[in-house]
Amino acid sequence: MEECCGTEGYGDFKAKKPGNREKPDVLLYDDPDNILAMKGISMKTYKPEVSFSQANRGSLETYVEELGISYGVAETLRAFVIKNHGGERTMLNEAPVSEQDELLNFFRLYQRQIVSHVLRGKAKAVLKADWLMLHETRDADWIKKVGNRQFWHLYPMAKVIDCCCSEEPSITKAGNLTLGLGMTLQRKGGDGGAKTANDLQFKLNPKIIHEQLSKA
């Protein structure tokens, strides 16, 4: 409470889960009518030995609209997520060099806005995630240890975004996109062949983020 709201003790603050699809998982507030003063927290539970957890996902069309993705970049991503008549996808490292360059230029130019969209929420959203709480699950009894300070790490989202943007976007050897430090973009897959398997999925590496920010 002291870190998020700048106050000692709980005072009149309460916590609730947003009744919408906004980015925060938990809202802290002392005045239920003052929405703009609410502090949003995004929470990620992770196993240190597991590299990535989902940060955001949606259809290509949704991201084209929300992120202003250009036509050329959108077509490269379309070939990346949707199989052709032969059942094949074009991994990003298999796309023509000119298309790879266009895609990388776009994500480099708008890296911070995109990372913020993924982690903090839509630019026009009223409720945003102001903080990121990472909770380590080291054994089967992790739920009982949620309140143990040893296992959770709280960081201002602005610092998390800075951390991710400390590394430039690049295409991996596997043909996915590294959007920044600890963040990747890939095809969701799975879902029994449903259309949602073609969604774009942003994944975050909580371990890397924690290791970098804990040094600061």
Per-region residue spans from a language model:
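Short, positively charged
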Residues: M1-P24, L28-A216
